[in-house]
A protein has these predicted regions:
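A short hydrophobic beta-strand element
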Residues: 63-72
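A solvent-exposed, acidic/Ser-Thr-rich amphipathic alpha-helical stretch
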Residues: 11-64
């Protein structure tokens, strides 16, 4: 449901899926420390851009924890496009609400720095840390 909300730019039940005191951490450092802030972020972010793809590749669930692997792409109103692979680590309450969600990102433009030498050859580009 959370992924669908981003794709449709509609709050389809943020109050129903997150606890009041949820802690939501994005892969690049922002952290939202309650449901009202998550709701504000969702609404505000969607005025600046749109999520065009958020595809679930696979997920694993055990007890109160779910790990979701996904591919994400957005298009911002200023013309910037971002895309990357990621993982969400989700912790659930006994009544099936999200109490913690941490995102981890991975660049798509991967390469082997040892492909041509025993010494690493790194690209001369700014690293995108998630």
């Amino acid at each position: 449901l959370w992924f669908e909300m981003w794709l449709t730019k509609q709050d389809l039940g943020i109050d129903n899926i997150f606890t009041e005191d949820v802690i939501y951490t994005e892969s690049w450092s922002p952290q939202y420390n309650n449901r009202q802030i998550v709701k504000h972020w969702f609404q505000e972010w969607n005025t600046r851009g749109k999520v065009v793809v958020w595809e679930i590749k696979q997920f694993f669930h055990k007890e109160n924890t779910t790990i979701v692997e996904w591919y994400f792409k957005n298009e911002m109103n200023n013309g910037n496009i971002e895309e990357f692979d990621g993982i969400s680590l989700v912790e659930w309450t006994k009544d099936d609400k999200i109490k913690s969600l941490k995102e981890f990102g991975c660049n798509l433009n991967n390469y082997n720095p040892y492909e041509h030498s025993d010494q690493p050859e790194f690209r001369e580009e700014r690293a995108r840390w998630f």
